[in-house]
């Protein structure tokens, strides 16, 4: 029997707003094990069928830790290739993002935060952390910046082990 999970990308769901301005969650599945979650800053170009450097990096971490898949969420759901776009948009969080974060936190075995210093915008990082905890997650980080924010996985060594994030 052929295992389609490893190579067939048709089964990787993503949740967008109807206008696709906001992406609330993105999944990748390659095995039958539990999922890891990554909660980052904001979505870029990855979608149901296309990966970007960040999702590829998160897949590498999750595979190294023995997970069979991952789910990616963001503290801001606005799709933008430049974080500066978050500062000028009327609603960078997105109308359904907090509920999406709650769902991700409930279903993942491990929740790794990595939104970096832009999480200070509107104190969103602190609020998102509270949402994750209220949903039952014990948030982790690969690195904590000097300012106290969880470092983005794209800029962290592949052999880094996540630690509790206060």
Regions found by a protein language model. Name each.
Residues 86-166:
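Glycine/proline-rich loop-helix segments at beta-alpha junctions forming the active-site rim
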Residues 1-52:
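Active-site and ligand/interface coordination hotspots across diverse enzymes
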Residues 41-46, 83-88, 113:
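Short, basic, glycine/proline-bearing loop/turn elements
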Residues 20, 52-59, 91-99:
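Short acidic (Asp/Glu) patches
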Residues 44-66:
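A short mixed-secondary-structure module that forms the rim of ligand-binding clefts
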Residues 43-44, 77-78, 118, 146-147:
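Short, solvent-exposed loop/turn segments at secondary-structure junctions
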Residues 68-84:
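Short connector loops at secondary-structure junctions
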């Amino acid at each position: 029997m052929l295992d389609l999970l490893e190579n067939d990308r048709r089964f990787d769901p993503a949740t967008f707003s109807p206008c696709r301005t906001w992406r609330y969650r993105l999944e990748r599945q390659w095995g039958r094990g539990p999922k890891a979650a990554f909660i980052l800053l904001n979505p870029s170009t990855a979608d149901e069928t296309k990966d970007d450097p960040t999702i590829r990096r998160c897949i590498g971490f999750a595979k190294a830790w023995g997970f069979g898949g991952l789910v990616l969420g963001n503290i801001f759901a606005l799709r933008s290739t430049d974080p500066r776009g978050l500062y000028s948009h009327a609603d960078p969080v997105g109308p359904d993002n907090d509920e999406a974060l709650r769902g991700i936190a409930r279903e993942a075995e491990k929740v790794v935060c990595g939104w970096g210093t832009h999480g200070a915008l509107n104190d969103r990082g602190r609020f998102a952390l509270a949402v994750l905890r209220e949903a039952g997650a014990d948030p982790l980080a690969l690195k904590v910046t000097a300012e106290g924010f969880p470092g983005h996985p794209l800029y962290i060594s592949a052999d880094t082990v996540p630690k509790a994030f206060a």
